[in-house]
UniProtKB/Swiss-Prot annotation:
It holds the Pfam family RNA_pol_L_2. It comes from the Archaea. Keywords: Cytoplasm, DNA-directed RNA polymerase, Nucleotidyltransferase, Transcription, Transferase. It is an enzyme of class 2 (transferase). PROSITE patterns: RNA_POL_L_13KD. One of its GO terms (biological process) is DNA-templated transcription. This is DNA-directed RNA polymerase subunit Rpo11. PANTHER family: DNA-DIRECTED RNA POLYMERASE I,II,III, DNA-DIRECTED RNA POLYMERASES I AND III SUBUNIT RPAC2. DNA-dependent RNA polymerase (RNAP) catalyzes the transcription of DNA into RNA using the four ribonucleoside triphosphates as substrates. It is found in: Cytoplasm.
Length: 98
């Protein structure tokens, strides 16, 4: 995965992400849009045959878009770690009958 900040201003950031599309960006945008400090988050896949996406984030006045994005990524990683651990725990307790 390659990440390139295409544009950044006081309360907006646009990031080009190569090597990822909906699998990563859909949950990230959902996480971002759940935050009070976010006015809008969305993404676009400019061409269906290329694994490239553009993430757009606009935050409320006084917030830093880079920091809000980093925080959302951290929270998403924590959520997936919890889900992964719970899944592994459940699988470990299953008894397989042959």
């Amino acid at each position: 995965m390659e990440i390139e900040v295409v544009d950044v201003s006081r309360n907006e950031i646009r990031v080009l992400i190569r090597g990822e599309t909906h699998t990563l960006l859909s949950p990230l945008v959902e996480e971002l849009n759940s935050l009070d400090e976010v006015e809008f988050a969305g993404y676009d896949v400019p061409h269906p045959l290329k694994e490239e996406s553009v993430l757009f984030l606009r935050v409320k006045e006084g917030m830093n878009p880079r920091e809000v994005l980093k925080g959302a990524i951290r929270r998403l990683m924590e959520k997936y770690e919890i889900i992964g651990n719970s899944f592994i725990e459940e699988l470990s307790s299953l008894k397989v009958n042959h």
